[in-house]
């Protein structure tokens, strides 16, 4: 029988999931996205060539891998078509490899307008969204008024769209004092999207299940990271979807008993983009060093990432939330040359803080407790054998395993798929 592997972020996103998914899809027949939208940014480097994907699963570069976009994804047809064209211009036959659930809610122009108007109105209290309409699209889904991909092919689309635009325009013009969304322009877009995407629509749940029954290896690719989960993250500084392993089942229709291994991707330090609490954040030369050496700029937004020491307490929480089978530690090479390396091993919690919450307010009030380990002078760049790592690097990895009670199964030592140490392959575990 085949194995079903979940790959997801276990920090605040940007952990390097794209490279690892691309690496592991060598053994997979299909890759499925299960949540998020084009606010994700997955960077792949293959033979020195860089590709950035936002919606399409990272397995698209593999000749024999089918890629699925599950119902848990909010789909921007406009962004998808742009991404498809970029890949097709590079001779990637996207239409032969990509299938999309008809139950994906669509991101419409009014969602983007609402997202941007809200962030502007919040001023200094902004959440730090990408402004791409993700949150408002999920709101329409939960409120049971979303236009889904399937609706593009139904006769009542015009009436449904007209009512929705009227509903959202009232808020846009009367409360936010911005321009209304034009119905005719939006309806014409919907007709264009219908024609462009018709051949890609597929019952994703049934297709994945048939592959499973045939004994094929499947992969489920997460976007963002555990600490951005709508339920378990640093609320309200979170995304609008279920980022944890539980989101796989709701976002694809493949039940939890069919998931065999959950891999948590985590950097050897910690980063965060945008607003929100970050207990181990660094504001000194070391933080600047990590940002510079790690090229810490978001693949989607281009925003500089905030950098800090590894937070083992937050990761221990992610291990529990996702029932992680193993960890992939990325960007170990960024720590090369540091005299000492600190690990956040726990928190001092104010007596007044409601410690059970583990939300944004909780993380804002805690003070991290640190443990200091010696750094290493040798380079880890491109190392593919664990025994070749500096002894101090091995000690750092072992200490992380002890603190989070989860094995480090994969270590990434550079951006290329070949710059990797695989201690335990998820498909062989």
Curated annotation (Swiss-Prot):
One MF term in the entry's GO annotations: GTP binding
Sequence positions that bind IMP: 14-17, 39-42, 130, 144, 224, 239, 303
Binding site for Mg(2+): 14, 41
One Pfam match: Adenylsucc_synt
Enzyme class: ligase
Active site: 14 (proton acceptor), 42 (proton donor)
Cofactor(s) for this UniProt protein: Mg(2+)
GO biological process: 'de novo' AMP biosynthetic process; IMP metabolic process
Record note on cofactor: Binds 1 Mg(2+) ion per subunit.
UniProt-annotated binding residues for substrate: 299-305
Main localization (coarse): cytoplasm
Pathway entry: Purine metabolism; AMP biosynthesis via de novo pathway; AMP from IMP: step 1/2
PROSITE patterns for this protein: ADENYLOSUCCIN_SYN_1 (PS01266), ADENYLOSUCCIN_SYN_2 (PS00513)
Binding site for GTP: 13-19, 41-43, 305, 331-333, 412-414
EC number of the protein: 6.3.4.4
Catalytic reaction annotation: IMP + L-aspartate + GTP = N(6)-(1,2-dicarboxyethyl)-AMP + GDP + phosphate + 2 H(+)
Function of the protein: Plays an important role in the de novo pathway of purine nucleotide biosynthesis. Catalyzes the first committed step in the biosynthesis of AMP from IMP.
Family: Belongs to the adenylosuccinate synthetase family.
Subunit structure: Homodimer.
Record protein name field: Adenylosuccinate synthetase
Provenance organism: Psychrobacter sp. (strain PRwf-1)
């Amino acid at each position: 029988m085949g194995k079903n592997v979940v790959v997801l972020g276990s920090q605040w996103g940007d952990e390097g999931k794209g490279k690892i998914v691309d690496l592991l899809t060598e053994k997979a027949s299909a890759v499925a996205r299960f949540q998020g939208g084009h606010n994700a940014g997955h960077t792949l480097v293959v033979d020195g060539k860089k590709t950035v994907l936002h919606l399409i699963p990272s397995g698209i570069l593999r000749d024999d891998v089918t890629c699925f976009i599950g119902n848990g994804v909010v789909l921007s047809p406009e962004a998808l078509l742009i991404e498809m064209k970029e890949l097709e211009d590079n001779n990637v036959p996207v239409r032969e490899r990509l299938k999309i659930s008809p139950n994906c809610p669509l991101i419409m122009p009014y969602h983007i307008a609402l997202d941007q108007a809200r962030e502007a109105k919040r001023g200094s209290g902004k959440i730090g969204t990408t402004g791409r309409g993700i949150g408002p699209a999920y709101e329409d889904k939960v409120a049971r008024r979303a236009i889904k991909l399937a609706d593009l092919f139904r006769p009542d689309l015009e009436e449904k769209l007209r009512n929705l635009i009227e509903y959202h325009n009232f808020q846009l013009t009367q409360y936010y004092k911005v321009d209304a969304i034009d119905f005719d322009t939006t309806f014409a877009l919907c007709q264009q999207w219908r024609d462009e995407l018709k051949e890609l629509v597929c019952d994703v749940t049934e297709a994945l299940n048939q592959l499973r029954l045939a004994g094929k290896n499947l992969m489920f690719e997460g976007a963002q990271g555990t600490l951005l989960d709508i339920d378990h993250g640093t609320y309200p500084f979170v995304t609008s979807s279920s980022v944890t392993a539980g989101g796989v089942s709701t976002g694809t229709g493949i039940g939890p008993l069919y998931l065999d291994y959950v891999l948590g991707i985590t950097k050897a330090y910690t980063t965060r983009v945008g607003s929100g609490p970050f207990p181990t954040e660094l504001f000194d030369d070391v933080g600047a060093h990590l940002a510079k050496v790690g090229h810490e700029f978001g693949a989607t937004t281009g925003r500089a990432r905030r950098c800090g020491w590894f937070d083992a307490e937050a990761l221990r929480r992610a291990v529990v939330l996702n029932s992680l089978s193993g960890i992939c530690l990325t960007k170990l090479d960024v720590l090369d040359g540091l005299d000492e390396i600190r690990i956040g091993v726990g928190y001092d919690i104010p007596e007044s803080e409601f410690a059970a919450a583990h939300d944004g307010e909780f993380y804002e009030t805690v003070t991290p407790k640190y443990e200091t380990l010696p750094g290493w002078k040798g380079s880890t760049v491109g190392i593919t054998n664990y025994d070749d790592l500096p002894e101090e690097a091995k000690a750092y990895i072992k200490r992380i395993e002890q603190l989070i009670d989860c094995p480090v199964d994969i270590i990434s030592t550079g951006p290329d798929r070949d710059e990797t140490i695989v201690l335990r392959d998820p498909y062989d575990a």
